C-alpha cells in the first residue's frame, strides 16, 4: 500500500505572528489536499516561494492572487489587499528558533557561518550574498543505501561592498 501524501499545515503556535490570510490559505490547501509543489506548478513559482507566500514572507503579484483564489476557492477580495502589500518579514517565529527543523538550519549558520563567509570572501572579495536578489530550492536525494538526503540550494547575487 503506497504511503499517503502528507501535507504541511499551519503551526497554531505562530498564527498570531502571521498575516490574517495565512490561516485561510493553509485551511484551503489542506481541504483541497494540495502540496506546495502542486500549488507552485499552478502559480509558475518555486515551492519555497509559494510557502513563503503562505507565511507572509513573500509579496504576491496580482497574478499570484488570481491563481491562488481560483485554485484554493478562496475569495480574491479576502486575500488580495494583504497579500499584495509589503511583507513584514522575519517575525514568523521566535529567535532563536524552537521548532527542531528550523533550529537545525539556524545551527548550520551558527556552526558554519564564518566558514561560509571566509570561502565566499576568498572567491568573490569583500561583500555579501543578497537575500533579495535570491532564489532557493529544496530537493531530495536517495543514496545507494536508501537513505534520504535533503539538498538545499541557496543562490544569491554577490554584492561587493563599495568604497566611499
UniProtKB/Swiss-Prot annotation:
InterPro entries in the cross-refs: Cyanase, Cyanate_lyase_C, Cyanate_lyase_C_sf, Lambda_DNA-bd_dom_sf
A GO term for molecular function: cyanate hydratase activity
Active site (catalytic residues): 104, 107, 130
Key words of the record: Lyase
Impact upon substituting residue 130 to A/T: Abolishes catalytic activity
Induction: Induced by cyanate and down-regulated by arginine.
EC number: 4.2.1.104
Catalytic activity reported: cyanate + hydrogencarbonate + 3 H(+) = NH4(+) + 2 CO2
HAMAP family: Cyanate_hydrat
Protein name (Swiss-Prot/TrEMBL): Cyanate hydratase
Organism: Sordaria macrospora (strain ATCC MYA-333 / DSM 997 / K(L3346) / K-hell)
